[in-house]
Amino acid sequence: MMPFEAVIGLEVHVQLNTKTKIFCSCSTSFGESPNSNTCPVCLGLPGALPVLNKEVVKKAIQLGTAIEANINQYSIFARKNYFYPDLPKAYQISQFEVPIVSDGKLEIDTKDGAKIVRIERVHMEEDAGKNIHEGSYSLVDLNRACTPLLEIVSKPDMRNSEEAIAYLKKLHAIVRFIGISDANMQEGNFRCDANVSIRPKGDEKLYTRVEIKNLNSFRFIAKAIEYEIERQSAAWESGRYHEEVVQETRLFDTAKGITLSMRNKEESADYRYFKDPDLYPVFIDEKLLKEAQKINELPGAKKIRYVRDFNLKEDDANLLVSDPLLAEYFESMLNLGVKAKTSVTWLCVELLGRLKAETTLENCGVSAHMLGALAKRIDEGKISGKSAKDVLDKLLEEKGGDVDALIEQMGLSQVNDTEAIVKVVEEVLKNNADKVLEYKSGKDKLFGFFVGQAMKNLKGANPSVVNAILKEKLD
């Protein structure tokens, strides 16, 4: 059997989190009544003229900076011509020959070590509307039409689904950390088209590529790529490669786990690109460039800092930088004086481990301040880890609350008063003089008995303090 390798390039569409659309002042809010966020511009009515949203340009520059790309201070918009019901103008305003960003890169972690994936270009464009199919008819919602997108086009540098997913997850984290998109995949704010081909290992030639459209979950992207590699490899082995693998667009059937032919893949010439006569070229001056290039700390830099400064395990650091909100919680807890190790345990293990499928960090009701206050009480010895779990359960049940008040109400405060603990310990030893003699004659297991008696009488003492005092008295 001939060994093959995959050749994978990805086109990612990121919907930007601007308040208004790219070429008009309509709202970009999600979930509104169909066709309510529309105007003559996004409806494509004759005579309506587009006006570029400056925030879109800024966000494109920010992404270009994050991927170490060239920011082209001169770029132009072009019309991409095609007919589809959700495209009222019969063309999409995009960029073609001169995009705003070019020649970037992302470093990803693979099983064989770090790898660079080259990014050919990032361009600004408007989104199309949405077709809704119901029975024998279809509806068109144009609320999404004219919503600002950045399309990020990689070079075909990935060789398997694992590398593709590593690239996508890295890009997904970056757009969220720099604040240009919420990248919500369920709402279609971060979606991917995968271009997949195969070739014999060692061959540098590029063979027929197939495009798989509109994938919006990491799991389905991986499955679609893996299926397509298997399909093309089987066609090659059977001698039917040229009949079965043609340049086309395919869809992934999530129920069956297979790709299905959708239409022949168009070449760029089929779209008849030409400069949009209604829009000026985009000129970026030095002031705007410098202003937009000030971006938040990137996930990779944050991870290095967490491992170096807080001695975190790499896996823990990777988890924290996978989501800006996780990193924000962690740093808020540190700012409250919680130890790094305690913060990771209570955020990544205790809190995340309790969140059910429909609950997220955003809507769970337990703020970073609440979780930090609880973790700090553990560090201070004012509550045991076991009792703190009960408090956390209560916070989740009631969607938040005052941590100290809950500790008091639930009677979970630990006694840290050394004098009070000494008195109780002495009382326990006095009342169990026979067992003290047995302990001193070698029955070490009785130490647990003394701890239990003291804890029972103290009703919530700090175990470490009780242990230390007992050791001192017995030894």
UniProtKB/Swiss-Prot annotation:
* GO molecular function list: asparaginyl-tRNA synthase (glutamine-hydrolyzing) activity; ATP binding; glutaminyl-tRNA synthase (glutamine-hydrolyzing) activity
Q: What is its EC number?
A: 6.3.5.-
**What are the protein's UniProt keywords?**
ATP-binding, Ligase, Nucleotide-binding, Protein biosynthesis
A Pfam family hit: GatB_Yqey
List the catalytic activities from the record. Answer: L-glutamyl-tRNA(Gln) + L-glutamine + ATP + H2O = L-glutaminyl-tRNA(Gln) + L-glutamate + ADP + phosphate + H(+); L-aspartyl-tRNA(Asn) + L-glutamine + ATP + H2O = L-asparaginyl-tRNA(Asn) + L-glutamate + ADP + phosphate + 2 H(+)
What InterPro entries does UniProt report for this protein, alphabetically?
A: Asn/Gln-tRNA_amidoTrfase_suB/E, Asn/Gln-tRNA_Trfase_suB/E_cat, Asn/Gln_amidotransferase, Asn/Gln_tRNA_amidoTrase-B-like, GatB, GatB_C_1, GatB_Yqey_C_2, Gln-tRNA_amidoTrfase_suB_CS
Coiled-coil boundaries = none
Instruction: Write down the superkingdom of origin.
Output: Bacteria
If you read the UniProt record, what top EC class would you report for this enzyme, in one word?
A: ligase
Output the GO biological process annotations, alphabetical, semicolon-separated. Answer: glutaminyl-tRNAGln biosynthesis via transamidation; translation
Family stated for the protein in its record? Belongs to the GatB/GatE family. GatB subfamily.
User: What job does this protein perform?
Assistant: Allows the formation of correctly charged Asn-tRNA(Asn) or Gln-tRNA(Gln) through the transamidation of misacylated Asp-tRNA(Asn) or Glu-tRNA(Gln) in organisms which lack either or both of asparaginyl-tRNA or glutaminyl-tRNA synthetases. The reaction takes place in the presence of glutamine and ATP through an activated phospho-Asp-tRNA(Asn) or phospho-Glu-tRNA(Gln).
Assembly state and interactors?
A: Heterotrimer of A, B and C subunits.
The molecule here is called Aspartyl/glutamyl-tRNA(Asn/Gln) amidotransferase subunit B
Q: What is the lineage of its organism?
A: Bacteria, Pseudomonadati, Campylobacterota, Epsilonproteobacteria, Campylobacterales
Q: Which gene encodes it?
A: gatB
